[in-house]
C-alpha cells in the first residue's frame, strides 16, 4: 500500500527501546464471505488467513524486529463449531503463526468460547501463560488458576498484563456449575430480553451474552500487580479482548463491569495504554488520567485489498503505533509525572 510511509522505519530519530506487533479478530473460517448479524458489514472469513500471512511477513522483515506479537482474541470464527471444524481451523491458523520469528501472546474472546470450552483452551496452544514473568518476592502478583491472566516484562521497566475479560461469562463453561449460575444471574439481572445477545432497551447495553467481565478475584490481582509497578516505576500496557472505555468503543462491546476495571487502573500511576479488540471498527481515546485506549480494527472485516494490523514502537516518552491498512497511525505520549 503506497499511501503510507515505510512502517519499518518508525521515525527519523532515535531507535525505539523495543517494538511489538498487534492484531485482532482474525476470525478465520473456511467459508465464503458473509455478513454480521445486522447484515450491515461484510466479513471475509477465508481471506483473514491471507491477511495474517501478510502481517507475519511484514513483522519478520521489519528493521526493528518486534519482541512479540499480541493477538487480541477471536482467532477463529464461531461458525467453525457449527461445521465441526474448530480444531482443524485452529490448527491451520496456529501453523500460520509458526512462520513468525517471535513469541505470540494470545487473549481469549467470545469466539474462542463458541468453539471450545475453557478447560480445552487452558490445555491448548492458545494458552500462552508459559511466557509469563513471575515476581518471586511478591507472591500476591501471581495470578490464580481460576482465570486466564498473566504479566510479562518485554523490556526493563515495562510490564504487560493480559486480562481475562470472560472470567465472568456464560460462554465456554459447564451449564451446571456454580460459576455459570452466578454469571447467568448477573446477566439476567441486567438484561431481561429473551434473546440475551440483544441490547434492545438496556440502560447498560454491555450486558449481553457475547460480552463478559472480570471477577473480583482477578481485579484484586490486577490491583496488586499495578501496586508493584507503581512502586518500581514501571510503565504498564494492559491487553484484553473486551474494551473498557466508553469513549473508545461502541457501548454494546464493553466489558460488563468495565467501571470496576477503570477505577482500579485510575487509582494507579503506571498504566499508559489499554489494548483491545472485539469492536471490529476500531476506536481510540485518551482518558482523563492519560491512559491511551486503543481498540484495534478487526481483520475479519478487512477487504482483500487492505490490511489490519500494526507495530507499536516504544520510546522513553511515548509509543508510536504504525498501522497498516485500516489501522491508523497513533502517537501516544505518556502522561507527565
UniProtKB/Swiss-Prot annotation:
Gene3D superfamilies (alphabetical): 3.60.21.10
Positions with a binding annotation for Zn(2+) 1: 25, 27, 74, 280
Catalytic activity entry: CDP-choline + H2O = phosphocholine + CMP + 2 H(+); ADP-D-ribose + H2O = D-ribose 5-phosphate + AMP + 2 H(+); CDP-glycerol + H2O = sn-glycerol 3-phosphate + CMP + 2 H(+)
UniProt key word GTP-binding: no
Keywords, sorted A to Z: Acetylation, Hydrolase, Magnesium, Metal-binding, Zinc
N-acetylmethionine modified-residue sites: 1
Enzyme Commission designation: 3.6.1.13, 3.6.1.16, 3.6.1.53
Tissue: Preferentially expressed in immune cells.
GO molecular function: 2',3'-cyclic-nucleotide 2'-phosphodiesterase activity; ADP-ribose diphosphatase activity; CDP-glycerol diphosphatase activity; manganese ion binding
Record-listed Zn(2+) 2 binding positions: 74, 110, 241, 278
Top EC class, one word: hydrolase
Required cofactor names: Mg(2+)
Family recorded in the similarity comment: Belongs to the ADPRibase-Mn family.
Reported function: Hydrolyzes ADP-ribose, IDP-ribose, CDP-glycerol, CDP-choline and CDP-ethanolamine, but not other non-reducing ADP-sugars or CDP-glucose. May be involved in immune cell signaling as suggested by the second-messenger role of ADP-ribose, which activates TRPM2 as a mediator of oxidative/nitrosative stress.
Quaternary organization: Monomer.
Protein name: Manganese-dependent ADP-ribose/CDP-alcohol diphosphatase
Organism from which the protein derives: Rattus norvegicus (Rat)
Lineage: Eukaryota, Metazoa, Chordata, Craniata, Vertebrata
Amino acid at each position: 500500500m503506497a499511501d503510507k510511509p515505510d512502517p519499518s522505519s518508525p521515525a527519523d530519530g532515535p531507535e525505539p527501546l523495543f517494538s511489538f506487533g498487534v492484531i485482532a479478530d482474525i476470525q478465520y473460517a473456511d467459508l465464503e464471505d458473509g455478513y454480521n448479524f445486522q447484515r450491515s458489514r461484510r466479513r471475509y472469513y477465508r481471506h483473514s488467513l491471507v491477511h495474517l500471512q501478510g502481517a507475519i511477513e511484514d513483522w519478520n522483515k521489519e528493521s526493528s524486529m518486534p519482541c512479540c506479537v499480541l493477538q487480541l482474541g477471536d482467532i477463529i470464527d464461531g461458525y467453525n463449531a457449527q461445521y465441526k471444524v474448530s480444531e482443524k481451523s485452529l490448527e491451520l491458523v496456529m501453523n500460520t503463526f509458526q512462520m513468525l520469528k517471535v513469541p505470540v501472546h494470545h487473549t481469549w474472546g467470545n469466539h474462542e468460547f463458541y468453539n471450545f470450552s475453557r478447560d480445552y483452551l487452558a490445555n491448548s496452544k492458545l494458552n500462552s501463560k508459559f511466557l509469563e514473568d513471575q515476581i518471586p518476592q511478591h507472591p500476591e502478583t501471581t495470578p490464580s488458576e481460576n482465570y486466564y491472566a498473566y504479566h510479562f516484562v518485554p523490556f526493563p521497566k515495562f510490564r504487560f498484563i493480559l486480562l481475562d475479560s470472560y472470567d465472568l461469562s456464560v460462554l465456554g463453561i459447564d451449564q451446571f456449575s456454580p460459576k455459570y449460575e452466578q454469571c447467568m444471574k448477573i446477566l439476567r439481572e441486567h438484561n431481561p430480553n429473551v434473546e440475551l445477545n440483544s441490547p434492545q432497551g438496556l440502560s447498560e447495553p454491555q450486558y449481553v451474552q457475547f460480552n463478559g467481565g472480570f471477577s473480583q478475584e482477578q481485579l484484586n490481582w490486577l490491583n496488586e500487580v499495578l501496586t508493584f509497578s507503581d512502586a518500581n516505576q514501571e510503565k504498564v500496557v494492559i491487553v484484553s479482548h473486551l474494551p473498557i472505555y466508553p469513549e473508545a468503543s461502541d457501548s454494546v462491546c464493553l466489558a460488563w463491569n468495565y467501571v470496576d476495571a477503570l477505577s482500579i487502573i485510575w487509582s494507579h500511576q503506571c498504566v499508559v495504554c489499554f489494548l483491545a479488540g472485539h469492536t471490529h471498527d476500531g476506536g481510540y481515546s485518551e482518558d482523563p488520567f492519560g491512559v491511551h485506549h486503543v481498540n484495534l480494527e478487526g481483520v475479519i472485516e478487512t477487504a482483500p485489498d487492505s490490511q489490519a494490523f500494526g507495530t507499536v514502537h516504544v520510546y522513553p516518552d511515548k509509543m508510536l503505533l504504525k498501522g497498516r491498512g485500516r489501522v491508523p497511525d497513533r502517537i501516544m505520549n505518556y502522561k507527565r509525572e
